[in-house]
Amino acid sequence: KLIPEKYNRGTDPTDYYKINHTVAMGILARTALYARDWQTAYDYASKVLEKNPYLMTEAEYKSGFNNCNNGEWLWGYSATQDDSDGAYTMNFKDKSLDGYGSLCVDPYFVENYHDNDYRKDLFQDWGYTAQGGKVVRLLNSKFAFQDIDNGITDMDLMRTSEMYLIKAEAAYYLHNTDEAKSVLYTLQQARMKEGKTAPEITATGEDLLKAIWLERRLELWGEGFAITDIIRNQQSIERKEFEGPVIIKEEDEEGNITTEEATGTGHDVLKFNDGTDFCPNSKYYLYRIPLNEELQNQNLYKNHEKLDFYR
């Protein structure tokens, strides 16, 4: 109510960090999803999509996720050369600069994309990562610098696709199965290559819910939702060891492509820090309060005693 519906934040990319009425409703939809308030999540996601139902084209999706002017972006941050980059983590998402590109994808995860899904094309290049130039992993082509010479780009904070997924999940819990399928299918069809049709959604019951959760992983990969979804849905991290022969392709400044055989690897960490297997509801999924903060803030546990779970 404090943000007028007609409030205009501006159209310049540097204005997209401001929260307008649509973004506020998106935040409410996201918050309600996390709180398992399904009707509120459904209502606000629906209102956002009434204002902006747009979903990216294939060309836009493959352009690097680096432009706040993208019609699907509801909220974003546009970095400039004048900004401080002390915590500018986008540097580690772009594979094109030597010493960076450490945000890699699980080779097994890519198998979840349909062959006609153009998102799958973004996870096909094996190459050397930031870790000393010796480790070969499956790199991501989803994120790219807008200005590679200066290492800056725009970063998305909220997209309409998230609203489709919130609406689909909320509809499922509200027992609107047909609508949940319809909303989910709308997003899946939008991610098919030109002339291709998304497979019919035949899943029912818990299988339909799992299909919605999987689509969140496929659509929002690398955008910061995975750990929250694992916690709220009481799921477990799933990782398998991967090591096998792969082909690395490199292109020089003249466009000549050379290939090299190498041994590709997947995750290094396959268990928790204490050596136990991954499981739901682990304390390792939670962000911890730094020890110095606990020592210096005498009132930290004044009203709520520190649980043994966190010791």
What annotation goes with each model-predicted range?
Residues 95-110, 119:
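Short, cationic low-complexity segments
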Residues 1-89, 113-311:
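Acidic/polar-rich alpha-helix caps and helix-coil junctions
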